[in-house]
């Protein structure tokens, strides 16, 4: 996926990225940051305006990343009219798992060998004044509460379970993520086409 300002998918034949956009396939396959979040949100908003009846399919393979951009992707997924089918391939860790969880309930899928990881948000601001660090810690706690509530709403797990699990890195297989409520389905391998 190209990186940069949100790009509008034009209907020019032969351009692979545009073809994928026309098919409504998105590939957030990197660390979540402002640039990637803005691009994904821009594409989702464009696709929403283009046709509210066609669903959107982000294929997630992300090690996580920044919390605020990740939450903005989640919020955009809730805002658009078309259903968003999230598909986990590879790894959906940290904010990647939050984005995965944000797909339309019953339309969140993990491929058979996918991995999912949840944990609490971290702060990267350590070299400031004591007062700044306290304010940052308060903000991180607010973000943690917000992310915890997303998992509670989207998985059906009680608050105390999610809070306890977010205290550490919790890795899950595709079937474990399904049992946890992060995804609804685990794709099955097609063995008919194998030699």
From Swiss-Prot:
Active site: 94 (nucleophile), 119
Top-level enzyme category: hydrolase
InterPro entries reported in the protein's UniProt record: ClpP, ClpP/crotonase-like_dom_sf, ClpP/TepA, ClpP_His_AS, ClpP_Ser_AS
Signal peptide interval: none
Top-rank lineage group of the source organism: Eukaryota
Molecular function (Gene Ontology), one example: ATP-dependent peptidase activity
Main subcellular location: plastid
Matches recorded under Gene3D superfamilies: 2-enoyl-CoA Hydratase, Chain A, domain 1
Enzyme Commission number(s) of this protein: 3.4.21.92
GO biological process: protein quality control for misfolded or incompletely synthesized proteins
Keywords tagged on the record: Chloroplast, Hydrolase, Plastid, Protease, Serine protease
Reaction it catalyzes: Hydrolysis of proteins to small peptides in the presence of ATP and magnesium. alpha-casein is the usual test substrate. In the absence of ATP, only oligopeptides shorter than five residues are hydrolyzed (such as succinyl-Leu-Tyr-|-NHMec, and Leu-Tyr-Leu-|-Tyr-Trp, in which cleavage of the -Tyr-|-Leu- and -Tyr-|-Trp bonds also occurs)
Cellular-component GO terms for this entry: chloroplast stroma; endopeptidase Clp complex
CDD domains attached to this UniProt entry: S14_ClpP_2
Compartment(s): Plastid, Chloroplast stroma
Function of the molecule: Cleaves peptides in various proteins in a process that requires ATP hydrolysis. Has a chymotrypsin-like activity. Plays a major role in the degradation of misfolded proteins.
Quaternary assembly: Component of the chloroplastic Clp protease core complex.
Family classification: Belongs to the peptidase S14 family.
Name by which UniProt lists this protein: ATP-dependent Clp protease proteolytic subunit
Native source organism of the sequence: Cycas taitungensis (Prince sago)
Higher taxonomy: Eukaryota, Viridiplantae, Streptophyta, Embryophyta, Tracheophyta
Gene that encodes it: clpP
């Amino acid at each position: 996926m190209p990186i940069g300002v949100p790009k509008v998918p034009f209907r020019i034949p032969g351009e692979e990225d545009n073809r994928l956009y026309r098919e409504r396939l998105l590939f957030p396959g990197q660390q979540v940051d402002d640039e990637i979040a803005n691009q994904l949100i821009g594409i989702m908003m464009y696709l929403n305006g283009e046709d509210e009846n066609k669903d959107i399919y982000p294929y997630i393979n992300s090690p996580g990343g920044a919390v605020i951009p990740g939450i903005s992707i989640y919020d955009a997924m809730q805002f658009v009219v078309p259903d968003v089918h999230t598909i986990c391939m590879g790894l959906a860790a940290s904010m990647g798992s939050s984005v995965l969880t944000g797909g339309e309930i019953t339309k969140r899928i993990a491929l058979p060998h996918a991995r999912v990881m949840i944990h609490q948000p971290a702060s990267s601001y350590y070299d400031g004044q004591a007062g700044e660090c306290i304010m940052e810690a308060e903000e991180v706690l607010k973000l943690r509460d917000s992310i915890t509530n997303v998992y509670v709403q989207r998985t059906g797990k009680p608050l105390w379970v999610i809070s306890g699990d977010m205290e550490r890195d919790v890795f899950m297989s595709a079937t474990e993520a399904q049992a946890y409520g992060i995804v609804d389905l685990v794709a099955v391998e097609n063995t008919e086409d194998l030699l």
